[in-house]
């Protein structure tokens, strides 16, 4: 039972029946006023709560207590089950019982005291002032794992079959004691992802009609539900974002929260709700451009770039310098912001030229020069922190490259980040056997060349050593995540088999723990992470 501020709810005596005849005098004390000591009650579905009430005429007796709505009707959803005497005369508890129909309701009712005059047969009703009684029944597909539950209902229960076409829907979040929920709100939803879209458990992109705070994160319309289908630990992305958040030279790291997803009444399993990578004051905080920003300082930013070998950005090109694991030389760049419809030819020419000039200088003879070398074009500190996250987490996608982001603000240098998509092969000797004894991303994209500069290498080593005490706390964080996700994992892996990821990897499982139990997979993840902290400093 939830009580709001105590209020005195006074009532008036109502004569329910009068004969109009002269009646015998009855000196029995009567109830003239009653007050209830709560203005709002929540009743869990199928359960009961106690409502304290006080009869001011302490010597009075009464025969019945009921609940009445406006017009004198008794509600079908709930009733008074019994009356319990209090410690003092005139003080009682009305036990109010939910009818167990499994429906939501929110009613204004009054507590009615019924008195009957034995000598005349007249009935008198005294009512309290109105108070609120409500119940929130669990929606279809309800699941209880200790995590917040995200309910998405598409219009007409329409399936989500496309990564391009949005489906209209409503979204509601049932929170926990620690995390506030979200009332039903309109949205659109579509699929997302590259390889991950083709697995049975789908990832989704949500676009709310109105910006909303979710789990304390900044207001925004766009949110992502990562399926973590192939991740037996359910925490690779979660832990990676935690590590990235420790990097003070990365301007922004997406906030995230594990949730359960119920789609059109069906439980879909454990998901990670995460902020989408977008240009925004509270996300990638760079200058927003217009199609008129084509000359001078205005054309210099901001830009959000993605390096991705899938080559599925609308605006993309390959710069010939640098190394990728897919075909050798050259790095694929794509423009994520400005949007393709808003990007002008002058802006594209500028950012392609900036990347080309940066790479030419980096691979030129004078690249170590602190004023006119690569440091003139790159935010070096961000590139160091970015590399450390990928290397500590054993993520080889930096070298592919896949889901690698950079951004450039107006008048600023090219900056690494944010981190994104850390589920494929993260902390796995299966995908990166070299991690047992060495580095994974020693030559990824531009890092092979950067590490040829002793000043860069010294700075990288010093930064790693500075961060090491923080990085050593991550195994404890993994333990916290394991406790948080245990019940979710039980339900999730009863529905989904991560080993099916082999269908997208030549018949071989990707992370190496897909056939393990949840707890064994977490222990393996933690062990490999600890190994990384031992191996990396020996190679710097």
Task: Enumerate the predicted regions with their spans.
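Middle-to-C-terminal accessory/interaction subdomains
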Residues: 158, 195, 199, 333-400, ...
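Conserved NTP-binding catalytic cores of kinases and kinase-like/nucleotidyltransferase enzymes
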Residues: 135-239
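Bacterial Sec-dependent N-terminal signal peptides
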Residues: 8, 13-38, 122-140
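Short, solvent-exposed loop/linker segments at the N-terminal edge
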Residues: 41-47
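Extracellular/luminal low-complexity segments enriched in Ser/Thr/Pro
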Residues: 91-102
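Extracellular acidic, Ser/Thr/Pro-rich low-complexity tracts
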Residues: 55-59
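Low-complexity "stalk/linker" and mucin-like segments enriched in Ser/Thr/Pro/Ala/Gly
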Residues: 68-91
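Internal "kinase-insert"/substrate-recognition segments embedded within catalytic cores
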Residues: 207-213, 227-229, 249-254, 266-388
């Amino acid at each position: 039972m939830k009580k709001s501020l105590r209020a005195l709810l006074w009532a008036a005596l109502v004569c329910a029946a009068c004969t109009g005849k002269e009646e015998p005098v009855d000196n029995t004390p009567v109830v003239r006023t009653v007050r209830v000591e709560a203005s709002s009650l929540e009743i869990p579905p199928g359960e009961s709560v106690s409502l304290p009430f006080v009869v001011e005429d302490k010597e009075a007796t009464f025969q019945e207590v009921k609940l009445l709505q406006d017009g004198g009707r008794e509600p079908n959803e709930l009733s008074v089950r019994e009356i319990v005497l209090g410690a003092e005369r005139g003080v009682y508890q009305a036990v109010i019982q939910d009818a167990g129909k499994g429906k939501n309701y929110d009613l204004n009712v009054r507590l009615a005291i019924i008195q009957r005059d034995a000598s005349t047969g007249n009935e008198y009703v005294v009512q309290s002032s109105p108070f609120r009684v409500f119940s929130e029944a669990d929606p279809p597909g309800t699941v209880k794992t200790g995590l917040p539950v995200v309910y998405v209902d598409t219009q007409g229960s329409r399936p989500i079959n496309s990564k391009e076409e949005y489906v209209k829907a409503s979204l509601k979040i049932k929170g926990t004691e620690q995390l506030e929920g979200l009332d039903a709100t309109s949205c659109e939803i579509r699929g997302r992802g590259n390889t991950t879209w083709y697995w049975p458990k789908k990832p989704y992109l949500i676009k709310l009609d109105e910006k909303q705070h979710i789990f304390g994160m900044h207001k925004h319309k766009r949110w992502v539900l990562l399926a973590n289908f192939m991740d037996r630990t359910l925490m690779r992305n979660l832990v990676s974002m935690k590590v990235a958040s420790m990097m003070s030279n990365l301007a922004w790291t997406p906030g995230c929260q594990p949730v359960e997803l119920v789609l059109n009444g069906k439980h879909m399993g454990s998901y990670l709700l995460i902020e989408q990578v977008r240009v925004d004051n509270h996300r990638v905080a760079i200058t927003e451009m217009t199609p008129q920003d084509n000359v001078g300082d205005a054309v210099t930013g901001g830009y959000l770039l993605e390096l991705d070998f899938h080559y599925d950005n609308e605006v993309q090109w390959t710069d010939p310098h640098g190394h990728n694991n897919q075909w050798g030389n050259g790095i694929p760049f794509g423009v994520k912001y400005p949007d393709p419809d808003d990007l002008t030819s002058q802006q594209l020419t500028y950012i392609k030229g900036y990347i080309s000039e940066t790479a030419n200088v980096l691979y030129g003879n004078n690249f170590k020069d602190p004023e006119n070398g690569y440091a003139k074009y790159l935010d070096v500190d961000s590139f160091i922190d970015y590399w450390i996250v990928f290397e500590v987490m054993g993520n080889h996608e930096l070298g592919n490259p896949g889901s690698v982001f950079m951004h450039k603000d107006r008048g600023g240098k090219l900056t690494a980040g944010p981190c994104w998509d850390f589920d494929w092969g993260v902390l796995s000797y299966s995908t990166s056997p070299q991690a047992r004894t060495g580095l994974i991303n020693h030559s990824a994209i531009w890092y092979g060349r950067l590490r040829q500069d002793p000043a860069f290498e010294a700075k990288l080593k010093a930064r790693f050593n500075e961060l090491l005490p923080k990085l050593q706390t991550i195994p404890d964080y993994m333990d916290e995540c394991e406790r948080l996700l245990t019940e979710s994992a039980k339900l999730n892996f009863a529905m989904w088999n991560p080993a099916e990821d082999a269908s997208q990897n030549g018949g071989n499982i990707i992370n190496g723990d897909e056939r393990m139990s949840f707890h064994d997979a977490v222990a393996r993840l933690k062990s490999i992470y600890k190994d990384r902290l031992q191996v990396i400093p020996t190679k710097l």
